[in-house]
A protein has these predicted regions:
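A short local structural element in Rossmann-fold oxidoreductases
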Residues: 71-74
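C-terminal helical subdomain
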Residues: 54-57, 61-69, 80-135
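Amphipathic alpha-helical dimer-interface segment in Rossmann-like NAD(P)H-dependent oxidoreductases
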Residues: 1-10
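Catalytic loop of short-chain dehydrogenase/reductase
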Residues: 9, 15-41, 46, 50-54, ...
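Conserved active-site region of classical short-chain dehydrogenase/reductase
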Residues: 1-2, 42, 101
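Generic structural signal for well-ordered alpha-helical scaffold segments
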Residues: 5, 49, 108-111
Length: 135
């Protein structure tokens, strides 16, 4: 933000999308530092909006509330072998996983919003309330 906001301010437009996790909205035991960091991102976005929205800069806070079906997230958590095994048996469209392509579509949509109806906070999650590992 420190580098980008002056550039966008000079241009008179721009979008800053900030990603965080479930911990930005609600805490969980043994995750004190993580919750503080994610909550800080949320407050940073609200503060940046207060300062820069009138200057044509859109800031949105995106909470990715669930496990993304990607090797660099789910794969690291489970290990490569188990990750591949689950993808083969459960499939890409399993209810409890968020597809990276769907996240990308949401980010693109936010970047294209008209300033008369900007979204400043979005919560992304799979339509299933029960994660696949709890079913």
């Amino acid at each position: 933000a420190k580098v980008l906001m002056p550039i966008m301010e000079e241009r008179g437009s721009g979008t800053l999308l900030v990603t965080s996790a479930t911990a930005a909205m609600r805490g969980n035991k043994n995750q004190h530092s993580h919750a503080a960091a994610m909550g800080g991102r949320r407050m940073l976005c609200q503060t940046l909006n207060a300062e820069f929205a009138s200057k044509g800069i859109h800031v949105a806070h995106i909470v990715v509330d669930g496990m993304v079906d990607a090797p660099d997230t789910l794969g690291k958590m489970l290990g490569e072998e188990l990750f591949q095994q689950l993808r083969e048996t459960k499939g890409m469209e399993h209810d409890g996983l968020i597809l990276p392509e769907s996240v990308a579509e949401t980010y693109y949509y936010l970047s294209q919003q008209h300033r008369s109806a900007w979204s400043h906070e979005v919560d992304i999650r799979a339509f299933s309330d029960t994660a696949w590992w709890n079913s």
